[in-house]
A protein has these predicted regions:
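Exposed acidic/polar residues on beta-strands and adjacent loops within beta-sheet cores, strongest
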Residues: 1-178
Length: 178
């Protein structure tokens, strides 16, 4: 690539590996903080277990940046509803974000949270991250992460500018328009 741009790959961090186990407590802390800030925690959700679902890493020399997704699933079925008009489902609380690893010190670079409702009894589809990192283009201290998203048959790409000062979405384009 020209103009001082460098392309670098992203790798999946293996669940249960020492690297995963080192990152998980920080990710859980960020999840809990985001839940409190966004008021996503209630008596019904607090007992549901949290899970670190995905972690991806990009390494450029001594600099390492991670993308993660974590979630909590809560059954939303209630005994006093009409299941014909309000079918049972699961509320999924998701927190995703980026971490900078500077010599073993993890610094959050931005997180986002979402609530989703998934109807029980329907095929869940393939298990995949909400955003699949495809690669990173870097220039100096800035990195642009190329991410692919999918919901049902809808696909899109999003570019995230990730730097030590934070994260911002630069562009989102539907896959059928690329």
């Amino acid at each position: 690539m020209s103009g001082g741009l460098q392309q670098s790959p992203v790798r999946a961090v293996v669940p249960g590996s020492p690297e995963w186990l080192r990152l998980a407590p920080t990710i859980v802390d960020l999840f809990e903080r985001r839940e409190r800030e966004q008021r996503l925690l209630s008596d019904k959700t607090s007992d549901a277990p949290r899970a670190v679902d995905w972690i991806y890493a990009n390494e450029d020399g001594a600099r390492r940046i991670y993308y993660f997704e974590a979630s909590r699933r809560v059954a939303s079925a209630s005994a006093d509803v009409d299941h014909d008009t309000d079918p049972p489902g699961t509320v999924r609380i998701t927190v995703a974000g980026f971490l900078h690893d500077a010599s073993g010190r993890l610094t959050p670079l931005g997180t986002k949270s979402e609530l989703r409702w998934e109807q029980d009894g329907l095929p869940a589809g393939p298990s995949r991250p909400d955003f699949l990192p495809l690669g990173v283009v870097a220039q100096g201290e800035r990195s642009v992460w190329v991410m692919k998203g999918q919901s049902g048959t809808s696909k899109w790409f999003t570019l995230y500018d990730v730097s030590t000062s934070g994260t911002r979405a630069l562009l989102t384009a539907r896959a059928d328009r690329c």
